Amino acid sequence: MIDLSSIVDSFTSILSIKILFLFLLGTFAGIAIGALPGLTTTMGVSLLISFTWGMEWIEAIVLIVSLHIGGTYGGSTSAIFLNIPGTPASAATALDGYPMAQRGEGGLARGIATFQSFLGTIFAAILFLVASPLLIDLGMNFGSWEYFLLAMFGIIISANLTAESLVKGLISGFLGLAIATIGMDKITGVQRFTFGESALMDGFSLIAILIGIFGIAEVIDSLMQLKPPLKPENSKSVLPTWKMLMKFLPIGIRSSGVGAITGAIPGVGADVAAWVSYDIQRRKSKSPETFGKGNPEGIVAAETANNACVPGSYVPMLTLGIPGDAVTAVIIGGLLLHGLQPGPLLTTQNPDIFYQFFVIIIVASVFMLVCGLFFTFLFQKVLAVPKSVILLIVTVLSVVGTFAVNNRTFDIAVMIAFGIVGFMMRKVGLAAPPLVLGIILGLMAEQNFRRAMVSADYSFLPFVTRPISLFLLVCIIFILLNQNQFLTKQFRRLRKNKG
């Protein structure tokens, strides 16, 4: 049951000049990062987390969530005016946004994207508030067996949905698990793979890894393909009429549901949500032949869904400790940095955590709406900044942010090393999110597996006799078998022979 008094208390707790300024700062930075092709929301969040060290956790979450929401929306700017999606989530927006801009309706397209992004985030935030306590109740029945399988399920889901192939995704995920074993064993106190280096006693700095994998790797990749400054089209800002917004409302509600549900599926992401919603609307439209030629319904479907995906992705992150996408994988690192352990026991640390997240999402959405409407022309100017200047700024922030956490030059070396690793992974087709998930969930998987074995006298039987554990195990086996091309071909051949 929703506690209205807790919602009111959560609202009053953020009504200070400092926190409202953090909302503005995070949203503004997010929209700018999202608008610049080549700079991702994941990179922005990973850089930001290091600068939240020393803040109160509520202030840090305000900054992070604001940047996440602003960044997801910001990708529509370059998608509409340049036909270059600022983020993968805005790729579907470009299909109809850019043709509208070519007709001189770029401002209208941007206005539609702004209002629909706001609607999608608000609608999904309400679903987040309703669904989260239900999943928490389920999570309270978890034991060591379920936690271990949940960690493995998250890694396998991410490997399946973010990599070119399941095998490559699993290689990346298990590499992350191997990296997570470096340091002192939390149970026995034995040093593992430290090679006498005291800086490795606690393993690698998670912030250094995140900034290296997502920030430095992106810088290296971008330096390999530098392009001239972008020149956005000029377009007058035109707000959609009330009649137009009411016409789009049914599409927006349906797309919000698609985005929220898709976001709650671990490893899927806003880009998938946008494409699924776009395809549904194209099929339901009375004029599907106009999609891709400047039909505003395409923008409504894509932008509502990809922004609704943001609150949706927080559901598995907070309730089960499994990231909904690459950005929430990084956000988990930020929560851990501030002493919050995502998962079923999170409410024991902070009983009102879901109400506070709900309020932060709502307020961040309002700031996104205001910034999107009033700073349209400024963000168009940002697109013209030379990419070399942006990359220099990102590099400096990466070094400063990494060093600031522990004041160790060793962490800078780790950041650079993982930046090179991240770049090489891109070149061979290995996805970064499974690696990051492996590192984040590695400790949880290892400790709970060992506890499960000890408590069951080293018997594997509880994995199949406990209902939730059995369900997770069946899901894992299904994913692995479903992606095995050899077995799939044999199954189809067997069915054909029987037919």
Cite the ranges covered by each PLM segment:
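Membrane-embedded alpha-helical segments of transport systems
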Residues: 69-74, 115-127, 135, 179, ...
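Helix-loop-helix hairpins and the membrane-proximal interhelical loops
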Residues: 1-60, 140, 191-295, 380, ...
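A structural-propensity feature for long, helix-poor, extended segments
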Residues: 68-79, 86, 295-320, 324, ...
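Membrane-embedded alpha-helical modules
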Residues: 111-228, 337-492
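Short helix-coil transition sites and intra-membrane helix breaks within transmembrane domains
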Residues: 32-42, 80-90, 124-127, 262-272, ...
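Re-entrant/interfacial helical elements at transmembrane boundaries that shape
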Residues: 41-51, 79-99, 130, 173-174, ...
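Transmembrane alpha-helix interface/packing and boundary motifs in multi-pass membrane proteins
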Residues: 27-41, 70-83, 158-163, 256-266, ...
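Membrane-interface alpha-helices at helix entry/exit sites of multi-pass transporters
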Residues: 58-62, 99-116, 286-298, 326-329, ...
